[in-house]
Regions:
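Alpha-helical transmembrane segments of polytopic membrane transporters and translocases
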Residues: 18-58, 90-94
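Interfacial segments at transmembrane-helix termini and the short loops linking adjacent helices
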Residues: 37, 86, 103-136
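Hydrophobic residues within alpha-helical transmembrane segments
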Residues: 50, 94, 131-134, 160-168, ...
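Helix-loop junctions and terminal segments of transmembrane helices
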Residues: 55-77, 82-85, 146
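Short alpha-helical transmembrane segments in multi-pass integral membrane proteins
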Residues: 84, 89-105, 184-207, 223-224, ...
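Membrane-interface junctions at transmembrane-helix termini in multi-pass inner-membrane proteins
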Residues: 134-164, 175
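Alpha-helical transmembrane segments
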Residues: 142-153, 202-219
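Membrane-interface helix-loop junctions in multi-pass transport and translocation proteins
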Residues: 156, 164-200, 214, 232-253
Length: 254
């Protein structure tokens, strides 16, 4: 609700900026009055949709261990509990980090490949998807922590962690989206900040509740490094074969 209103405020405060940067979109939409809704729709329809595909995918790999985590916690078997939690953390890190960082590195190219007939939406959404991809590291952490809290009977903790994060996101949106130069991209930044806050709180809460040091930072190092390598290599490879990929895609995608 707040994002379109803040965008409209930014549009009214500096119409010249938007007229210069989004002139083609304004013409296609029949006037600047529809620009805010167009930008918000592009963000939610493209950037957010692509971003949320990955947690749906990664959740499948760690979900099988959750009943075993609950059983080990109920029986008080600390060693088995630590081992199963470590399995979930590693699987989510190994799969999630490369996917998110690769999505960030290839944000515009992925959107252009999948939505080749919607170039105006892509132009609005590409930067937001780049930012969201970087923040996927925090989403991977926070979603893992929330799943663990739920299976050990601490369903109150996700709520306690999410409420401050959502409050920060709301405040950040209200005061920054209305700045014309950054506009809709702030929605992605505020989302990353929210997940970072939830991940940080979840990190300390998990160790405080369980009394176990899971060495999470150390376990993140290798998957995170692998994700960075994947992102860099994808950019390099695309530089060589990008035109060929686009040509082939044009034959099959509308």
């Amino acid at each position: 609700i707040t994002i379109p209103r803040c965008l409209n405020f930014a549009l009214s405060s500096d119409p010249g900026y938007f007229a210069a940067c989004f002139s083609d979109i304004i013409k296609a939409q029949g006037g600047a009055v529809r620009l805010a809704n167009f930008m918000y729709g592009s963000y939610t329809g493209l950037s957010w949709t692509m971003f949320m595909l990955i947690p749906s995918f990664t959740a499948m790999f760690g979900r099988s261990a959750l009943p075993q985590i609950a059983g080990a916690w109920t029986l008080g078997n600390r060693n088995e509990f630590e081992r199963k939690v470590t399995v979930v953390l590693r699987s989510n890190f190994v799969i999630g980090f490369p996917l998110y960082l690769g999505l960030s590195a290839m944000s515009r190219q992925i959107l252009e490949f999948l939505f080749s007939g919607r170039q105006q939406e892509v132009s609005v959404s590409a930067t937001s998807l780049f930012i969201l991809g970087l923040g996927g590291v925090f989403l991977t952490l926070s979603s893992t922590f929330i799943s663990i809290f739920q299976v050990i009977g601490r369903s109150d903790l996700p709520v306690k962690l999410m409420l401050p994060g959502c409050a920060v996101k709301l405040i950040f949106n209200v005061f920054t989206i209305s700045v014309p130069a950054i506009n809709i991209n702030v929605a992605a930044v505020s989302t990353v900040i929210m997940y970072a806050a939830v991940a940080l709180g979840g990190y300390f809460a998990l160790e405080n509740v369980t009394g176990i040091d899971f060495h999470i930072i150390r376990r993140m190092a290798v998957p995170l490094s692998a994700g960075v390598v994947c992102a860099v290599v994808s950019r390099i490879v695309y530089g060589f074969v990008g035109e060929s990929v686009n040509a082939v895609a044009a034959l099959f995608l509308p």
